[in-house]
């Protein structure tokens, strides 16, 4: 099974001024992110505004990004949903686009119990021949997949190869203490990157790497080299950026940050709205203070 890389970016979806998906810009953004140090890209995840993309748009995005960078880095398709049968169908369709793996979010809104989570993920993963990464984000889904459920899936389903985890460090430690060999954990929260690494996480599926990819690469490389003081210094320097990008709902400020740093990707789609002038100015100050502007 592939490792996918330590620094992955949850890619935004570029839009034209009238709100259509800008596929050409998506290919350009993919190349831009790879040049900035990303070892893999997650397409049509939360940051990619997946709830407001049609299946047809998502499939074309997968094809676009695979064509642009699939020969260089891993491309992971966000195909999870709260409908098991639909997630199976869509995951099979996505597999035919040439992606290297799937990201499967915990079912949201219907709030399944732990046994429901187990059966859902097992059914989806066993329906495809691609490696699957689970995605636990309780703040978005209102359900927390417990470590025991994650570990059960890791042991029982060979192509479930890792998890993007957004719970606290204690939950991460519980997962890592019982994980089978080769099972990877990526932080799903930029602000938790260094704490997660110290407990044993493999890397991060990042949002901030849209604008501070090289710096995050420096942080990870310093940690892996045993230079924890340098890694901590990078973490402290980048923490205001991590926090600033999430001052309002993601990906509103990530798209604003890309515009401010000279790589515009268009607006967000309703029901999200673009950053206000005040929000953008506050973000500009954060980016300038961090040396990004």
From Swiss-Prot:
The record marks 46, 109 as: Part of a proton relay during catalysis. Disulfide bonds: none annotated. Its EC number is 4.3.3.7. Pyruvate binds at residues 47, 205. Belongs to the DapA family. Homotetramer; dimer of dimers. This is 4-hydroxy-tetrahydrodipicolinate synthase.
